[in-house]
Amino acid sequence: MVTIRADEISNIIRERIEQYNREVKIVNTGTVLQVGDGIARIHGLDEVMAGELVEFEEGTIGIALNLESNNVGVVLMGDGLMIQEGSSVKATGKIAQIPVSEAYLGRVINALAKPIDGRGEISASESRLIESPAPGIISRRSVYEPLQTGLIAIDSMIPIGRGQRELIIGDRQTGKTAVATDTILNQQGQNVICVYVAIGQKASSVAQVVTTFQERGAMEYTIVVAETADSPATLQYLAPYTGAALAEYFMYRERHTLIIYDDLSKQAQAYRQMSLLLRRPPGREAYPGDVFYLHSRLLERAAKSSSQLGEGSMTALPIVETQSGDVSAYIPTNVISITDGQIFLSADLFNAGIRPAINVGISVSRVGSAAQIKAMKQVAGKSKLELAQFAELEAFAQFASDLDKATQNQLARGQRLRELLKQSQSAPLTVAEQISTIYTGTNGYLDSLEIGQVRKFLVELRTYLKTNKPQFQEIISSTKTFTEEAETLLKDAIQDQMERFRLQEQL
């Protein structure tokens, strides 16, 4: 028979009482009233904060955007097909954040910073809020260093500086993405980290861009954030902020970064969809009232850090699509007013074979020559004015039959200047090559050539300079000025090449 020992039992009870930990955990919960179209209405969640992450029973995460008197409007970061009416939801007490680290370089990720390239997990010890506040006035300095795009038309006439925000705007199929990707390709060896954000694009287009980067060795310094057309609107809306958070991580570590948002029209459309489903009042073009704030808080995060913060920079190139060249629509005017200038791509120029199809007349950089090296200022100072005058003359010359010699010469020079601005895709030029090309055109060396021969001559001239006059490149790179010695070297090269070119053409 088992004997009950009272002392042993009392010891066990005493031990259990001592070990008893009365931990009370308060969880802010609610119940799903309605779910559909990527939106859930929740009853409860009384203590939830605006922008707080909430977790559904089956694991889907959402963001509380609408805090109303009797329910909470939540946008889902997933399809939410398994969420049922009456299931429970709990507030996490966190705001959307992503892990950040150097390991993200060379990877393709989604808006939640999860890899989608099938190359395994990404290790990261730090995290950043997706919606970080933009740097204040004191922590910035004015833009003064050039960010070379490798495109003559931009670097000579619409220069972009490190820390600037320059809008690329144009109709569909006018080469907007090509300008942006060429700029990324040109950052090779420049110690610039690039982030390419694809919003609501076809998966095939994103794959094509990634393949180009891989083939040209640009993925080593690039992160691609992609939310394709079949992604939920919430993730398309978040993708640019995720890209900005990654770029900021490097900027605050005293590095230079370049971020491309391709494109913000689709982000605005995703936000409009979310807002209308949340029953927020629509405004102009059915966009919600805070669509300006959507883009301003994103683009204000691009900055040139002050010397106290290590002079890092984040340059933003947002892309906006127009409908049949209408720059006065709601989203284009908003983004034009936020950015420090715009590059306008024209469908007419593109169809006329002028590529990149940059309309120099209405494109502008509000930073201007502060973002150019001295050599480029010396050589390209007058070219924008000359081209603008040429465009005006050309329009006038269509109606006039007999033109005087000076006008004919000006038209001939303008046509050759326009020809030298043409460039193949994925073929960025160094600063020295650009300077030699512009100098040749603006000083009349191309006037004696037929228009069809201009590009061939310039390609051969650049090759000749590289092989026979390497000092030219060295002078430009080291002094950043167009010295007399550099000019002499260039003049000799042009004359030598012109003689060789003439002989070739005669054969």
Curated annotation (Swiss-Prot):
Name of the gene: atpA
- Could you tell me which NCBIfam families the record lists for this protein? atpA (TIGR00962), PRK13343.1 (NF009884)
Transmembrane as UniProt keyword:
no
Phylogenetic classification of the source organism: Eukaryota, Viridiplantae, Streptophyta, Embryophyta, Tracheophyta
* EC number(s) on file: 7.1.2.2
Cross-referenced HAMAP family: ATP_synth_alpha_bact
An example GO biological process term is:
proton motive force-driven ATP synthesis
Q: Where is this site: Required for activity?
A: 363
Reaction equations catalysed: ATP + H2O + 4 H(+)(in) = ADP + phosphate + 5 H(+)(out)
Q: Which named protein is this? A: ATP synthase subunit alpha, chloroplastic
Topological category with respect to the lipid bilayer: Peripheral membrane protein
Which PROSITE patterns does the UniProt entry name for this protein? ATPASE_ALPHA_BETA (PS00152)
Assembly description: F-type ATPases have 2 components, CF(1) - the catalytic core - and CF(0) - the membrane proton channel. CF(1) has five subunits: alpha(3), beta(3), gamma(1), delta(1), epsilon(1). CF(0) has four main subunits: a, b, b' and c.
